[in-house]
Amino acid sequence: MFDTEDVGVFLGLDVGKTAHHGHGLTPAGKKVLDKQLPNSEPRLRAVFDKLAAKFGTVLVIVDQPASIGALPLTVARDAGCKVAYLPGLAMRRIADLYPGEAKTDAKDAAVIADAARTMAHTLRSLELTDEITAELSVLVGFDQDLAAEATRTSNRIRGLLTQFHPSLERVLGPRLDHQAVTWLLERYGSPAALRKAGRRRLVELVRPKAPRMAQRLIDDIFDALDEQTVVVPGTGTLDIVVPSLASSLTAVHEQRRALEAQINALLEAHPLSPVLTSMPGVGVRTAAVLLVTVGDGTSFPTAAHLASYAGLAPTTKSSGTSIHGEHAPRGGNRQLKRAMFLSAFACMNADPASRTYYDRQRARGKTHTQALLRLARQRISVLFAMLRDGTFYESRMPAGVELAA
């Protein structure tokens, strides 16, 4: 639980682009501030200093710690204030307990301040981020934006191919991440253009970019072209749209590769990098996400707290004798949960202990996704211990399991 014993005033901030609404409450619930605060360092600092001089320790609570909430938090820290974060979902649920249906900045700020005063367990601590982690946070966010853009563009290409030539989509769609395929579509975007270029010429053009796949890829393309003899109306527009989309997809992939190199350079400069990357399934991007979301792990008392934060701890539901059991939680840090889920999937071929744990869960009747989530939960306990002790990963087989000779 967040410690609020020495707090003299709880200052809830409903952050905004140009101004924040501040609402200050004493531990007894007396209102001492309720006004707009311009999003500028001098004005924010003046308010923090004035409250600190009169009431002592000031706890500044925001509902959005990143983006527009970054400046007030930085100024508050520099002014000697404590800082905390009230998650948006918790804030909205708490707001429903207050009378009235109006939603205003003033009401939101009051809810944030009162929640901090009366329900300290709902608050999340905000560690002082070092320069490397702060830079990683920005780069990781940008990389995730690029990944979403790549997915959107790929889906658009696959949608067009499915509409006009489904057989061709079945060949090219799953391979759009390969640079040889995007290079090919940049130059030959329609079935007619591919057929006109000819099998032999396409093999020669693609071979430098995909030496082992070139012949098989072109053979699959022409087999798909032969399957469809009719021309769907509008197919000619593919010569215009698909090359443009393929070019955009290539550019996004190049940006992500360049960004990965920058993330890797920052990661190598962080002391926890060797610890994180020693765990199977944790690469550059996953390690960066772990640093951004977990830090050094000191803000979590136990591995169970970290698992709960990640949304990997089972939620118990019980009501009399008719409803009982444990279910996967819907909340948690989705960014961290996704990173742990994907790393659990990636590690199974590299770590015999993880594979054995997964197979054991499947043998107990768990689905593929359920088994991966359980593996991710087990790995987050290992991750917590690694961060706590500063030790590298050691593969250990579950008790009672022997490896084949």
From Swiss-Prot:
Entry keyword set: Transposable element
Example GO BP: DNA transposition
Pfam families per the UniProt record, alphabetical: DEDD_Tnp_IS110, Transposase_20
This protein's name: Insertion element IS110 uncharacterized 43.6 kDa protein
UniProt cross-references to InterPro entries, sorted A to Z: Transp_IS110-like_N, Transpos_IS110, Transposase_20
Domain of life according to the entry: Bacteria
GO molecular-function terms, A-Z: DNA binding; transposase activity
Keyword Secreted: no
